[in-house]
Amino acid sequence: MGLLDGKAAIVTGSARGIGRATAELFAGEGAKVLINDLDADVAEQAAGEIDGETAVHAGDLTKTGAADELVAAAVDAFGAVDIVVNNAGYTWDGVAHRMTDEQFQAMLDIHTVVPFRVARALAPHWREAAKAERNEGKEVFRKLINISSTSGTMGNAGQVNYSAAKAGVVGVTKTLAKEWGQFKINVNAVAFGFVETRLTAAKEAGGEMTSPSGEKIELGIPEQMRAMASAIIPLGRPATPAEASGPVLFLASPLANYMHGQILNVTGGMFGGMYT
């Protein structure tokens, strides 16, 4: 028996990194999982490699109507949605005095606006189901998990845009928890510290991605900063994506039915930003 047997989940940004590890873990615990990524080919490949029932919905979630299409795709594929993890995102770093409006807005769009829109798209499905269950004397929990960061809770030099956006999703989480608790919808967030993904790889390696607007963005952080980050983590190293996915599974499972409106810090003991 798996912790998520019979459940259907959406994990955004689930073709790589923490999202991919989360999708794999959910599937291993019995959930059906909708795989989402900006790159359709990468999403299809991930879905094919995950051992379990999956569906794919690729595309730019920042586009108008995309969140509604995402939820509709999951309902069409699985009949219902029980768990949603708002994980999709990327970084576009720069010091504040050189940051463009486009850079700043792009982070707000993917890290704050998209989770809000996904939640709004879920509302008619989850609220109406909960009302019917309440009338029947049933208590059924559904799970909304937003991914934040210590950049959002503590701030981080060179990431004023990302920090603002990840702080914003904390506000979204806490407000939805107050509004939706009556419907037995657990709303929580995970604030990660340093996790080894392509976003935190050495910048010297030359990693890059193309933003939804077509902009080429350098990924990673300088090797010197990576060394400093490891030095201030009491556990002595960054997390792996697999380690990061465990707390997300906890929040998605019945073990966390009475955990609500919380920001779970998963940092290896690091309480500040990655560097100051």
Kindly label every feature range from the protein language model:
Residues 2-34:
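Canonical Rossmann dinucleotide-binding motif of NAD(H)/NADP(H)-dependent dehydrogenases/reductases
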Residues 95-96, 100-108, 229:
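Substrate-binding pocket helix/loop in short-chain dehydrogenase/reductase
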Residues 119, 165, 173:
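Active-site helix of classical SDR
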Residues 149:
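Residue(s) in the substrate-gating loop at a strand-loop-helix junction
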Residues 181, 186, 259-261:
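Short, small/polar-rich loop/turn modules that mediate ligand/substrate recognition or access, typified
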